[in-house]
Amino acid sequence: MFKKADRKEARERRHLRVRKKVFGTPERPRLSVYRSEKNIYAQIIDDVNAVTLVAASSLDKAIEVKGSNKEAAKLVGELVAKRAIEKGINDVVFDRGGYVYHGRVEALASGAREAGLKF
């Protein structure tokens, strides 16, 4: 019971440490990742104006996943990259949200890179 709470708190501490260094500007916004048990969410954020420019998640109607969570994460990465490029955003700073760069987070990042986003 306590282990999950400790894991969540450790992730939040890591995220705060990373957020001190990772900052999104209007020229190069931040690609933020949030991972829940079932779904994965990605936002491209301009931290100067505190505005979400683009968002995508595995709950979007554009994503119909019949496979694994990693496949869904890759599709979310491709979708967020496609939406960002439509808005003229090509370069971003990747914010893994305190999660280990592995599994679903890595799949989302590789999907976004393959779709043309640079980070």
UniProtKB/Swiss-Prot annotation:
Part of the 50S ribosomal subunit; part of the 5S rRNA/L5/L18/L25 subcomplex. Contacts the 5S and 23S rRNAs. The gene is rplR. This is Large ribosomal subunit protein uL18. The lineage of its organism: Bacteria, Bacillati, Bacillota, Clostridia, Eubacteriales. Gene3D superfamilies: 3.30.420.100. It comes from the Bacteria. InterPro entries: Ribosomal_uL18_bac-type, Ribosomal_uL18_bac/euk. One of its GO terms (biological process) is translation. NCBIfam families: L18_bact. This is one of the proteins that bind and probably mediate the attachment of the 5S RNA into the large ribosomal subunit, where it forms part of the central protuberance. It comes from Clostridium perfringens (strain 13 / Type A).
